[in-house]
């Protein structure tokens, strides 16, 4: 067999490993943490709680330990392995919560810079867009989606983490991811809406986020300043 042919077959048969292992780790940790071992068995609905109890299995615990080692070694995962994890979560009645929580955890890996909380909102939106773009690319090893019109509008078609989910539950992953990034950036109350979804028949998925309140610390600071002014006037 010619060398170039052997090399070609090896390339085809070996899946590309692009996804950081921490993606798998956070998904399984959220799955495990959602389980409630203290549920009252007599009152439970087995069709609802049994799939959740599966998250406490030895198989999941062993895989969590494997991913913990992979994270330390910088090992990356193949898309097929990540999609299998998403399919596992989709079968659970609390899948949306697991995806949302994992998205938030993966977005909060870095310590937020507080300077972004005192700049104009247009700057905050620009910073948030940059953080979403960079962190998703770092996690999945490629560009994930893009940005549409508006201050914060994430868009994409056939995104890597949604390919395994025709029902749209996995979309909550990016909802949680964007929510965390915006909260870190602005420090106040944030609203993220999944306004378009391919699972609902739209031609693409879209997430729109906005700041709807000031950071609590800034509000308290203003209140303290007002009290000092009033005290001085008296």
Where are these regions (language model features)?
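N-terminal accessory segment detector
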Residues: 1-152, 160-169, 198-208, 212-234
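Short, well-ordered coil loops that connect the C-terminus of an alpha-helix to the N-terminus
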Residues: 142, 187-188
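Active-site helix/loop of acyl-thioester processing domains in fatty-acid/polyketide metabolism
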Residues: 172-187
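Alpha-helix boundary/interfacial micro-motifs
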Residues: 174, 192-193, 220
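Low-complexity, intrinsically disordered Gly/Pro/Thr-rich segments
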Residues: 188-197
């Amino acid at each position: 067999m010619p060398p170039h042919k052997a090399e070609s077959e090896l390339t085809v048969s070996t899946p590309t490993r692009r996804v950081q292992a921490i993606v798998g780790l956070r998904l399984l940790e959220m799955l495990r943490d959602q389980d409630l071992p203290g549920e009252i068995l007599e009152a439970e609905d087995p069709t609802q709680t049994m799939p959740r109890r599966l998250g406490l299995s030895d198989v999941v615990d062993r895989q969590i330990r494997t991913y913990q080692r992979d994270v330390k070694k910088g090992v990356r995962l193949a898309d097929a392995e990540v999609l299998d994890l998403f399919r596992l979560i989709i079968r659970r009645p609390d899948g949306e919560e697991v995806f949302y929580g994992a998205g938030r955890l993966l977005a909060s890996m870095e310590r937020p810079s507080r300077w972004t909380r005192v700049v104009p909102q247009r700057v905050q939106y620009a910073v948030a867009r940059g953080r979403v773009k960079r962190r998703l690319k770092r996690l999945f090893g490629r560009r994930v989606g893009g940005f549409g019109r508006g201050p914060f509008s994430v868009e994409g078609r056939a995104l890597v983490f949604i390919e395994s989910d025709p029902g749209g539950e996995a979309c909550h992953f990016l909802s949680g991811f964007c929510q965390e990034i915006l909260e870190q950036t602005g420090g106040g109350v944030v609203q993220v809406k999944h306004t378009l979804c391919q699972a609902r028949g739209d031609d693409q998925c879209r997430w729109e986020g906005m700041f709807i309140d000031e950071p609590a610390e800034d509000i308290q600071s203003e209140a303290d300043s007002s009290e000092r002014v009033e005290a001085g006037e008296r």
